[in-house]
Amino acid sequence: MSTLRAKRSMRLDARHLRYRRTQGEGAVLHCFLLDCSGSMLAGERLARAKGMLVALFDRAYRERATIALVCFGGGRAEVRRQPGAAHWFNERWIAPIGGGGGTPLALGLSSAATVLERAARHRPAQRRWLWVLTDGRTNEKPQAPASADEIVVVDFEEGSIRAGRGKALALDWGARYITADALSEGGDHSYHRGV
């Protein structure tokens, strides 16, 4: 409207144009790293994680954030969704994701790091978040990807005896930590660094 007010009844030219600074499309990338190993099948943790992904993707859709998804399990890692806009139909392509086998966390992180590094080259001003959804059942202790501005470890470990590996990863990486239960209860802002 301000451009039209400046123009009034005159012919439109460059001096009449008014610009409004806005945050660029996809100013934030949320890259999700989903543990699809056999241990996540126990207690329907993988199903809970996929439901949580749908909710987080829906939130990204409302916020016009960019999303990516890397799945790891069974000795391999796969980029299931390259960075792009979130859509309202996320459940359709998340539901068929299966699980089983070992927990190649380092391989998954390597794939996520590649996605984040490529995004950093194409959009250097974009803020890059890495969300690691895992039960932490791995003996690997990989380094955190340097290309992530923020890392959130969402811990799906359950049971009376817990190894605490998800929390240990968050501490090692200086990452934010939240349990799956706390995130499910709407505590998406209650995660905290390391503890």
Regions found by a protein language model. Give the residues of each.
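Acidic, polar low-complexity linker/tail segments
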Residues: 1-31, 39-45, 62-63, 77
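…and closely analogous acidic/polar surface helices at protein-protein or active-site interfaces
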Residues: 27-28, 38-69, 85
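Structural motif
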Residues: 29-31, 127-131
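Residues that scaffold, gate, or flank divalent-cation-dependent active/transport sites
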Residues: 35, 135
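Short beta-strand-loop
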Residues: 66-96, 141-144, 167
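Von Willebrand factor
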Residues: 77, 88-128, 137, 155-164
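C-terminal helix of von Willebrand factor
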Residues: 110, 168-195
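VWA/integrin I-like adhesion module and closely mimicked acidic/polar interface patches used
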Residues: 136-181
